Amino acid sequence: MNNTPREIPPEQSLIEYPCRFPIKVMGAHTEEFVTAMVFIAKAFEPDFDHATVEKRPSKGGNYVGLTLSIYVTHREQLDEIYRTLTSHPLVKYTL
């Protein structure tokens, strides 16, 4: 069985580019985590405003969910953002 993701042709994509795309990322509830995620967002969108980051702490307060709405221009850029976030050592999950 082949587990490689197949490419979705642009005409079949549900996302219309360019757009502001909300990315949810979860990690430890620390300022270091938030700062690192904003730094990554700014690497892809230099004008990214950290004040737009939505924060939702977990019930126990140990973790925080962030929503980063990043302006993306094409699918490859969105894929690269996800790869960068998921490879960061402070990130637990991305959606």
Question: Predicted regions span which residues?
Answer:
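Long, contiguous binding/interaction regions
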Residues: M1-G65, Y71-L95
